[in-house]
């Protein structure tokens, strides 16, 4: 039976489209959903438990509070839902595993001599992006194929440096050396256009263009260029031969199928362009236990194409999608042309889906073999923590905190993040202590916690600070824990789960409990906590030592008249360290911009 507060929240829900957020007693968002009519959708959860699926029953039993956001349409609600799931990664939502940093290929069309390289973020900077790819390995393979076919430059300057002779890349046939004039601007632009067509799956157009360029080069007796075009044609034909499918397909389409075991689903996507398979990717989905097949695929389609740079006119799926009409409308708007979603239930689409599904099953099998021991251990650890600490759910997100200083100098704090038992280094954050003087670790912890949670509900919070942790781990005992608990209470976060892990006896302290919890030394839960604690310590210490090192460099150079911040940075950049500057010859010092003979002599004398 919902609490009176929850019943009032449900009763006050509007009959508008929008997004609803369900929170547990700790204030953690555990589910995000969208609805054409908010009131009707949310009320459908609060029926007799016997009418609910087991997973939904567990969700409803955890709901303590509701929030909602009204949108102008169901399509707007879909986009907002996607952004909130990506930001908060709620425990009960189906979600792409590790979706925060999928790699893309970027073509820098905003540069005179464009490059093609791997990136994990997209910007509105005039570049062209392809992806996302499921792994760094797959995007590196694609980049390697492109490099061998088109030999574009890979130097990491926006403008290639003028050189008198080509570099090693040219000698090993990996670059056409625009920096030495070995290729004209027009020919280089042709090359990049061919690479784009290739990535779009239009290899037949590339072949026609290359054949034309080969014949033109041969006619003007430019046999070196003609031979290059011939080799490119041969290589592309080899690639095309490997793209034939057993099933007969035509046109441009993506085919999507999945295989499931427990809470993990492996989704396989085949990218078909002009009747040929130009690529395939595998993605892991979490939170799929007891979900309907059509719902699982709907969630994948939403989350994948939300960040995809290429949307085909046709998408074939293994099962009918629960949100097909709204997804078609949304994808058509994103593509700028009609998108049709169909289920491959018979005929040629079914033959194609069967192949994709077989690949998904094989990928799931390989993933299970690879991750069996580690995944089982992490699951055991999280479930053991839930039981030992009395948490409502296994702690999906654990944040670890530590302080590092020497008698109050160069004091820093660290925050490390583990999700589902694995470190999420992109979310790590470090804090330089600003308000505390002297060696007062308790006050330093208070500052770090205040700054971290002060960003919680800000628009610019970023992914590191936007979500509340399921569990906070403090490196220390009762004193450190009490200090942090006091700060959390002051911030209105009384329900936040927090523990201290004391290093001497590896005892776990909980707020309000006089006796610590002691776990067995071989306990997966204790080993996970130790790893989080040690990682927070390592991250804080590394930052502290880095600041000390820079402080030492600064003080040594500050004693030299004429060396200000700009020259100091330039010297360190050129020679790497004070030791490197000390060992530099007078002539080497004079090569540094802004260093004249008198200043160089002063540096040599004073160092």
Curated annotation (Swiss-Prot):
Q: Name one GO biological process term.
A: SOS response
Localization (cell): Cytoplasm
Q: Which CDD domains match?
A: GIY-YIG_UvrC_Cho
Q: Where is the GIY-YIG domain?
A: 15-94
Entry GO CC:
cytoplasm; excinuclease repair complex
List, in alphabetical order, the Gene Ontology terms for molecular function in this entry: DNA binding; excinuclease ABC activity
UniProtKB keywords? Cytoplasm, DNA damage, DNA excision, DNA repair, Excision nuclease, SOS response
The record's listing under InterPro entries reads: GIY-YIG_endonuc (IPR000305), GIY-YIG_endonuc_sf (IPR035901), GIY-YIG_UvrC_Cho (IPR047296), Hlx-hairpin-Hlx_DNA-bd_motif (IPR003583), RuvA_2-like (IPR010994), UVR_dom (IPR001943), UVR_dom_sf (IPR036876), UvrABC_protein_C (IPR050066)
Residues of the signal sequence?
A: none
- The UVR domain covers 204-239
What highest taxon heads this organism's lineage?
Bacteria
UniProt cross-references to PANTHER family, sorted A to Z: UVRABC SYSTEM PROTEIN C, UVRC/OXIDOREDUCTASE
Q: Which family does it belong to?
A: Belongs to the UvrC family.
Q: What does this protein do?
A: The UvrABC repair system catalyzes the recognition and processing of DNA lesions. UvrC both incises the 5' and 3' sides of the lesion. The N-terminal half is responsible for the 3' incision and the C-terminal half is responsible for the 5' incision.
Family matches, as NCBIfam families: PRK00558.1-5, uvrC
Quaternary structure, from the entry: Interacts with UvrB in an incision complex.
**Name of protein:** UvrABC system protein C
């Amino acid at each position: 039976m919902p609490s009176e507060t929850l019943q009032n929240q449900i009763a006050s829900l509007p009959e508008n489209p929008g997004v609803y957020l369900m929170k547990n007693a700790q204030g953690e968002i555990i589910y995000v959903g969208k609805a054409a009519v908010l009131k009707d959708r949310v009320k459908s959860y609060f029926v007799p438990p016997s009418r609910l699926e087991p997973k939904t029953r567990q969700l409803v039993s955890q709901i303590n509070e509701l929030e909602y956001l009204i949108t102008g349409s169901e399509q707007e609600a879909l986009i907002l839902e996607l952004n909130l799931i990506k930001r908060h990664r709620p425990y009960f939502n189906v979600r792409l595993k590790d979706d925060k940093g999928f790699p893309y290929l970027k073509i820098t069309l905003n540069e005179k001599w464009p490059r093609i390289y791997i990136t994990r973020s997209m910007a509105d900077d005039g570049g062209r992006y392809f992806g996302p790819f499921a792994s760094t390995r797959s995007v590196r393979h694609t980049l390697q194929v492109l490099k061998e076919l088109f030999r574009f430059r890979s130097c990491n300057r926006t403008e290639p440096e003028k050189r008198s002779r080509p570099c090693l890349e040219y000698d090993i046939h990996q670059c056409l050396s625009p920096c030495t004039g070995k290729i004209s601007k027009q020919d280089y632009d042709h090359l990049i256009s061919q690479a784009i067509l290739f990535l779009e799956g239009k290899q037949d157009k590339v072949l026609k263009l290359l054949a034309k360029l080969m014949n033109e080069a041969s006619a003007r007796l430019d046999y070196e260029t003609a031979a290059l075009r011939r080799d490119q044609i041969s290589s592309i034909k080899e690639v095309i031969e490997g793209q034939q499918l057993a099933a007969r397909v035509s046109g441009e389409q993506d085919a999507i199928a999945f295989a499931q075991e427990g809470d993990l689903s492996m989704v396989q996507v085949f990218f078909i362009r002009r009747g040929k398979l130009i690529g395939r990717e595998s993605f892991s989905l979490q939170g799929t236990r007891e979900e309907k097949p059509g719902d699982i695929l709907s969630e994948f389609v939403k989350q994948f194409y939300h960040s995809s740079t290429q949307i085909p006119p046709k998408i074939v799926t293994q099962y009918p999608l629960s949100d097909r009409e709204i997804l078609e409308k949304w994808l058509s708007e994103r593509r700028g042309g009609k998108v049709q979603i169909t289920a491959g239930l018979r005929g040629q689409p079914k033959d194609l889906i069967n192949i994709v599904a077989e690949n998904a099953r094989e990928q799931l099998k390989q993933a299970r073999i690879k991750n069996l021991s580690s995944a089982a251990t992490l699951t055991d650890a999280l479930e053991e923590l839930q039981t030992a600490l009395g948490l409502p759910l296994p702690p999906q997100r654990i944040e670890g905190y530590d302080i590092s200083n020497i008698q109050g100098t160069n004091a820093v704090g660290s925050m490390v993040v583990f999700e589902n038992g694995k470190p999420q280094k992109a979310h790590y954050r470090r804090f330089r202590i600003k308000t505390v003087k002297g060696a007062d670790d308790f006050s330093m912890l208070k500052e770090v916690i205040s700054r971290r949670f002060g960003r919680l509900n800000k628009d610019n919070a970023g992914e590191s600070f936007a979500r509340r942790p399921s569990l906070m781990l403090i490196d220390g005992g009762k004193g450190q824990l009490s200090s942090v608990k006091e700060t959390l209470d002051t911030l209105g976060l009384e329900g936040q789960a927090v523990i201290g892990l004391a290093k001497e006896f590896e005892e776990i302290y909980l707020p309000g409990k006089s006796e610590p919890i002691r776990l067995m030394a071989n306990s997966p839960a204790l080993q996970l906590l130790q790893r989080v604690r040690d990682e927070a310590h390592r991250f804080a210490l590394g930052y502290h030592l880095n600041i000390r090192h820079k402080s030492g460099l600064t003080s040594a150079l500050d004693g030299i008249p004429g060396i200000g911040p700009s020259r100091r940075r330039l010297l360190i950049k050129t020679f790497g360290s004070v030791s490197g500057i000390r060992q530099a010859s007078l002539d080497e010092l004079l090569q540094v911009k802004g260093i004249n003979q008198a200043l160089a002599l002063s540096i040599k004398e004073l160092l």
